[in-house]
Amino acid sequence: MTATALVAGRTALVTGGTLGIGFGIATQLKEHGAQVAVTGLSDQECAKAREAGFSAHVLDVRDREACKKVVADVVAEFGELNVLASNAGVYPQSSIEEMTDEDIDLIFDINVKGTIHAVQASMPELIKSGRGRVVLTSSITGNYTGYPAWSHYGATKAAQMGFVRSAAIELARKGVTVNAVLPGNIVTPGLEAMGKDYLDNMAKSVPAGFLGEPKDIGATVAFLASDGARYITGQGIVVDGGQILPEEPAALDGI
């Protein structure tokens, strides 16, 4: 546990929490004092998460009833649920020209409907806790910038932010805040597979001069889940090393 212990005594559920950014979120919440349950797509993923000290549950967020079952299991184990970090998502590539209905349905079913399912399932417990926190993992893509072959992904991330703003208003008087973290380029196993040269070139496009890590997203989620963020709701917090700023990184050379 860190010295700050932002979420000590709270119980958090992190969907898609067995890998990458999700695992970084789960780890930071745990280090800040929370009891943490994660979900993953396979028994193998969940077994590794349990070895790391997490309660772990197999879940496909497209299944509304399965989401309710996981929440019930978490409450049965820990007694309550205070924090939902809705992180489960996919980011397949496809050009607009080649995109099929199946491609579109898959990404919207997971990134948008799956997010809503997780929030719906968690709401009764979050409201009951009196200090509920919902934090979505969205993206700068679709909200501040765009990339070729990810137009459908960007559309889902913009939709998530629309959900955040309206859900924040709907739940504000019920003691629940709803926010999102919008990551820039974060080093995950998928990105590392692109190779060192690719990562080095990507880092040069970021004013900070380096790529973020899952723990950077996790630390932001831990803050948004804390009492220190009680007056923050309906917001998207960008964590990108200055990536969306208009200044050309080359202009920083020599400074």
Residue ranges and their predicted role:
Residues 95-96, 103-108, 202:
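Substrate-binding pocket helix/loop in short-chain dehydrogenase/reductase
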Residues 2, 233-255:
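Short C-terminal tail/terminal secondary-structure segment
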Residues 119, 156, 164:
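Active-site helix of classical SDR
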Residues 11, 18-20:
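Conserved glycine-rich cofactor-binding loop
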